[in-house]
Design a protein with these regions (language model features):
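A short C-terminal boundary segment appended to hydrolase-like catalytic domains
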Residues: 109-147
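Conserved beta-sheet core of the metallophosphoesterase superfamily
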Residues: 24-28, 33-118
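Residues that act as N-cap/strand-start positions at coil-to-secondary-structure junctions
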Residues: 8-10, 99
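Short acidic-hydrophobic surface loop/beta-edge motif
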Residues: 10-22, 71-73
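Active-site neighborhood of divalent metal-dependent phosphoester bond hydrolases
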Residues: 1-6
């Protein structure tokens, strides 16, 4: 598809350049690994805390955890992007919650390159018809096969 750009494997840094001054900030997109934590912000927080001085991005967008969230961590606008996969038996067994949906993000950048504002409009989708159909199948009587 011509409207998509492959940013690479696991993580990518994109320059956000101010249209008049040319000053830049960095946006990081990342698909990290690991399991889901009890606190929604824990995994992004630990990733951002692990950056060396001078390498933190201004904005970080995370996938993988099936969560939607905006939080500021150590001066970084951290966003969890949500997912397009609804909860399945595996997720239910692991006691996970999936946030199905995504976000529209608006950034306002100062002439010195600093990201002053980060506005996120989250859109969450709740389609329980599939899950309800699956659950209703389990309440039907079981019939023994004749021999």
């Amino acid at each position: 598809r011509s409207d998509l750009k492959d940013l690479g494997y696991i993580e990518a840094f994109t320059a956000l350049e101010h249209s008049e001054s040319g000053k830049r900030a960095r946006l990081m997109t990342m698909h990290p690994g690991g399991g889901s934590a009890y606190a929604t912000s824990y995994a992004p927080q630990k990733i951002i805390e692990a950056f060396q001085p001078g390498e933190k991005p201004a904005v970080a967008i995370f996938g993988h955890y099936h969560k939607m969230e905006y939080v500021q961590i150590r001066g970084v606008h951290a966003i969890q992007a949500g997912c397009t996969k609804d909860l399945d038996p595996f997720g239910r067994k692991k006691r996970l919650s999936y946030h199905v949906g995504g976000a529209i993000i608006e950034l306002r950048q100062l002439p010195d390159g600093t990201i002053q504002d980060c506005i996120c409009w989250f859109r969450q989708y709740h389609d329980r018809s599939y899950v309800n159909d699956q659950c209703s199948n389990s309440h039907r009587p079981t019939r023994k096969k004749s021999r």
